[in-house]
């Protein structure tokens, strides 16, 4: 627990070093596989473990972390909640022409990015490796093609599976149906670590042996991350915002509610919450952020996908009674919003602080052994 607190403090300090407009995108991939270990060991315990676990179904996980940046100008509005839809605003499409003079901005950001990379490397509990251009291209392909369970080595010779969307909002990539669930209401308390709530392992289907109860503390996203024994992706997007601009925007929204507080009591309650938030930012010098969190599901069978969607909804409720929204009309739009490098386009988010946003990151590498 002390190590988790240390990691949390280090990450908070690293994010404070980044300028406003920087976007941190953690993309976690989970997929099922079978355990195979052909290594011979003279250690009786290791040999027995390998024999017992061999050919059993397991859940694999790997994480990619992307850092993107903007031109640094404060000419955009501060986004405050998850209610906006990009279909009502100007189009956000990936890989459009970079803004003017981005080479100069890249030179400015180089020192920040180097410090961030060195800071992550210095955390003993982490092991990171910078992607080269080929690996980055492969990662983008694996996400768009939903082939993350078999990562591609050279995507330049590959074509993405055809995509189709019908009038009901159902989306298919190749032969796989896609579903996205976005976090819209945070739970009452955010914690660096929490003893996770878990459902019965039989409810998840499959042959992966999941623990019915866990006594050790895990990252807050465990119920929708390692706690779901089927293929899925979890995206966490943290955009560093300017604290002064954020407080000003929230203050303006608070003032706009003055006209309805007399006949609509919830407006007065919201004003009190907004004032308390702004006071906390000012008093403790917190770094503000715009945070988005979603889960991407894919399955060849639509009925199976619906069952998995229900299990993810349950997982959100286990995450401190958080609430999620099952995307329909915005499904395709949000899928493209989470392409590596395009995460700033994700509009299903909310304002909080980096101290709170870091709680959503997956910070552990977990190995759960069989009780036998």
Regions found by a protein language model. Name each.
Residues 365-372:
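The Walker A/P-loop phosphate-binding site
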């Amino acid at each position: 627990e002390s190590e988790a607190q240390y990691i949390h403090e280090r990450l908070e300090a690293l994010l404070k070093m980044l300028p406003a407009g920087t976007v941190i995108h953690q993309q976690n991939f989970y997929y099922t596989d079978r355990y195979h270990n052909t290594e011979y060991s003279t250690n009786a315990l290791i040999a027995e473990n390998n024999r017992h676990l061999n050919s059993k179904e397991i859940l694999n996980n790997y994480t990619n972390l992307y850092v993107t940046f903007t031109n640094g100008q404060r000419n955009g509005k501060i986004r405050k909640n998850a209610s906006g839809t990009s279909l009502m605003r100007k189009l956000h499409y990936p890989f459009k022409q970079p803004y003017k003079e981005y080479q100069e901005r890249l030179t400015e950001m180089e020192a920040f990015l180097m410090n961030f990379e060195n800071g992550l490397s210095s955390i003993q509990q982490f092991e990171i490796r910078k992607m080269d251009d080929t690996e980055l291209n492969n990662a983008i392909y694996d996400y768009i093609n939903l082939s993350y369970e078999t990562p591609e080595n050279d995507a330049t010779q590959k074509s993405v599976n055809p995509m189709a969307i019908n009038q009901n909002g159902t989306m298919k990539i190749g032969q796989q149906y896609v579903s996205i669930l976005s976090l819209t209401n945070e739970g009452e308390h955010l914690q660096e670590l929490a003893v996770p709530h878990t459902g019965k392992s039989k409810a998840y289907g499959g042959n992966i042996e999941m623990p019915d109860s866990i006594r050790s503390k895990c990252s807050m996203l465990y119920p929708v991350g390692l706690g779901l024994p089927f293929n899925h992706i979890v995206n966490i997007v943290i955009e560093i915002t300017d604290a002064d601009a954020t407080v000003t925007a929230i203050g303006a929204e608070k003032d706009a509610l003055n006209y309805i507080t007399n006949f609509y009591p919830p407006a007065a309650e919201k004003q009190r919450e907004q004032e308390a938030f702004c006071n906390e930012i000012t008093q403790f010098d917190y770094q503000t952020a715009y945070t988005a969190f979603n889960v991407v599901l894919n399955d060849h069978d639509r009925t199976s996908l619906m069952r998995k969607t229900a299990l993810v909804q349950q997982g959100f409720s286990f995450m401190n009674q958080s609430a999620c929204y099952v995307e329909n009309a915005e499904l395709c739009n949000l899928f493209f919003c989470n392409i590596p490098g395009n995460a700033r386009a994700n509009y299903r988010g909310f304002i909080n602080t980096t101290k709170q946003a870091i709680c959503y990151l997956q910070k552990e590498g977990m190995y759960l052994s069989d009780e036998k």
